[in-house]
Amino acid sequence: VNSSAPERRRQLLRISLQAVVADLSGGSHTAADLPGGAWLVDGATLWVRLDDAPHRALGAAIAIALREEVDRVEVLVGDPDPAPLVARRASQWSLPISVRGLDGRSPFPVEPVGHRAPPTVPDSHLDLVETIVAAGAEPVVAHGVLTAQYRGLEIAKVVDDDGAPRLDVGVGVNDREAFRELHAGEAPEASLARVVEAVSAHRVDGARPHPFNTMSPEGYLAWRLRDDPSALGVGSLVTTPGAVAPVGAVDPGPVMMLGGGRLFACTTGFDLGALPDALDAREVAVVAGVIDDASLTVVVPARNRLPVIDRMASAAAAEVRVVEVP
């Protein structure tokens, strides 16, 4: 039976990790899968091979390290580009974590990369803010990009089209391509208003499951808390960008918020990459001086407060509080 391409990739990662560890420490080990990579334990050391979005997959590695009660973590990253970011995030934990790149089967040291100032949004793009507001959506600027959101879900993005700004409407890449074909020639404001109307029926408390409310649940939680910040004991909340741009418009990731001189991270409770994202954002906020309290508050729905969240929070180098909301 032919295995699928993803399974073949997972198998290659397991074999790669086993070979590297055998070269370095001798002996034979059997690696297992983790989201975005592979892992094995050699004595008191967890070895991890990260592949897909390694800066977020680091969270799964840390969760396994805490479960296995190892003394240290050795992280191997095959792609040299994200490896310095992984090294920076590894330094934000009290658990000793070493990050190395891979040249074939040979590991090499990786230096952490510093935080970079985000690019600015072109003025021509900002001219579309009024269009976004008029359609009933919320304009959001992050990482040099202007997007339109509705109750925490990104429903459009401003892009360059032959040097001119254009509102690319839809939820995710595939939806935007289909929307362009179906509604070619329609005014951007009308297109966006059409999406707002479609999403609004589903993005409400108690609605039956639908892609419009199962995507970006963190965004919806953050929107609810901004609408009523009293649950967090602050007078107001505003969203703030994460330390790095998200992998995709509807991919998991915490929504960061500022309020009362504190930094909050809204997450579902199931996303193991949320804490590495949030701790990286905390570092940016501390350096920028935008918070008075250097701790991080992780906000999760009460029904989703899994023990792993608290274990990971206690393993962070900074103080991390976990709070529940209804």
At which residue positions do the language-model features occur?
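Charged, terminal alpha-helix-loop-beta segments
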Residues: V1-P326
